[in-house]
């Protein structure tokens, strides 16, 4: 069964998340790694895990992934959304 994952992609400054711009996504995948693969296909970027966040190969952007929870993430607008129409 596939789960929903909440994904934030933002820029970095000095190796830390900067949040001067932000894109939010909801991804349906079997695992967190599957969500990373889906975002790699969509963005055309490769991601590496540093223990806290996923960094792009260039290091200029980072990605955070968490389980999607309607209570916390339901009010955001998303750049891409894999929820079914009945779940929105």
Question: Each PLM stretch: what is its role?
Answer:
Residues 10-12, 30-32, 57, 70:
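Generic structural motif
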Residues 35-39:
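Short amphipathic, charge-patterned alpha-helical segments
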Residues 22-25, 40-44:
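Short intrinsically disordered coil segments
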Residues 42-88:
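Short, mixed-charge low-complexity intrinsically disordered segments
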Residues 19-32:
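A short, exposed loop/beta-hairpin motif centered on an aromatic-Gly-Thr core
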Residues 1-22:
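Short aromatic-glycine-(Arg/Gly/Cys) micro-motifs in beta-strand/loop hairpins
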